[in-house]
Regions:
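Conserved structural motif at the start of ABC-family nucleotide-binding domains
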Residues: 7, 26-28
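Catalytic Walker B motif of ABC-type/P-loop ATPase nucleotide-binding domains
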Residues: 168-171
């Protein structure tokens, strides 16, 4: 086993025992999580992501197979030892409404306190630092019952941070957060991995942020099982497209996102640079155009306030905003049967 491997599984079967019945969710899973990496677990609802996280977190026993934590069999750890090694944040709603936010996050320090669980000054500092890291330090004196779903999620992540564990397992940590908070949270978790050497595994439906900040991706589904790899390797191997694409949806490797696949589109050449190229292309493809290098129609984007539409080396129309451009290209009746030719206006 490599020295940088935090947790490893061999031939793992995960699922549930219901009396004498056994419900297998996945079989034959083998993988490793390394120190200093942020791994994003992606998959459709019902794929078994939460089951896998609970199994790795020690709250649900595997049906068969072996898990090793820092090279040692998981079964040899005591609960207290696991609580010092693994910080687990699940989507289960916490029943701690009568506690203050500070009290709840303080529970994360209990693996490090003495028999009576008394917080020392250093423990209190860590609690406040954890609250500040997720942006809810101002809620320290509030009751958990008073929090919004997003605030409660941040508090539970702060509790995991207060544990100061080398391994963090988080089930959809950004599910209830607004757009800005989602980005901030993902950036925080990536920073914990990159700068503090923590091992972070989180499940998410936010593919864009996973592609941007995930060192590795785990793709999980009932029919395909678990596919693991470096983010860019999975992009260029086609695994991302095969895993998520549907009949009319494809993964655009150039832009790193999914988009509707247009069966037929008007041909146009786009001349632009940088971010202006990206957003002009976005407007064109959204409205049924396909970019080609040698189309009859040419759109020249000089700035967000200066566009020129050419046909056969002659300027046919100018626009001073995206709004004008989009309004014009939406007039489908302006185009002849040959969709790459614009009539005289």
């Amino acid at each position: 086993m490599r020295s940088d491997v935090m947790i490893q599984a061999r031939n793992l079967t995960i699922g549930y025992r219901q009396g004498r019945k056994v419900k297998k969710v996945h079989t034959g899973l083998s993988f490793a999580l390394r120190q200093g990496e942020l791994t994003c677990l992606l998959g459709p609802n019902g794929a078994g992501k939460s089951t896998l996280l609970r199994t790795l977190g020690g709250t649900q026993a595997p049906l068969t197979g072996d898990i090793f934590l820092e090279g040692r069999s998981f079964t040899t750890y005591t609960e207290k030892e696991i609580s010092r090694k693994i910080g687990l944040v699940l989507t289960d709603r916490t029943m701690a409404g009568g506690l203050t936010v500070f009290d709840l996050v303080s529970l994360g320090r209990h693996p490090h306190t003495g028999f009576f669980g008394r917080l020392q000054k250093r423990d209190e500092e860590i609690v406040y630092q954890s609250l500040d890291a997720v942006g809810v330090a101002f809620k320290a004196g509030s009751y958990v019952a008073e929090l919004s779903d997003g605030e409660r999620q941040k508090v539970m992540i702060a509790k995991a941070l207060a544990q100061e564990c080398p391994l963090l397992l988080l089930d959809e940590p950004t599910a209830f957060l607004d757009v800005v908070s989602r980005i901030e949270m993902m950036d925080l978790l990536h920073e914990l991995a990159e700068k503090k050497g923590k091992t972070v595994l989180l499940s998410t439906h936010d593919l864009e942020q996973a592609l941007l900040l995930g060192d590795r991706l785990w793709l999980l589904s009932r029919d395909k099982g678990l596919v693991c790899g470096a983010t860019e390797d999975l992009v260029f191997s086609g695994e991302i497209n095969q895993f998520f694409a549907r009949n009319e949806i494809i993964f655009d490797r150039k832009n790193g996102n999914f988009r509707p696949q247009k069966r037929e589109g008007k041909k146009i050449t786009l001349k632009a640079e940088g971010e202006l190229f990206f957003w002009t292309q976005n407007a064109l493809t959204r409205n049924g155009f396909q970019l080609e290098e040698q189309a009859t129609l040419v759109l020249e984007a000089c700035s967000p306030h200066a566009f020129r539409l050419w046909e056969n080396n002659q300027i046919k129309k100018t626009f001073t905003s995206f709004e004008q451009l989009i309004a014009f290209i939406k007039q489908k009746e302006l185009f002849r049967e040959r969709e790459d030719i614009l009539p005289e206006l």
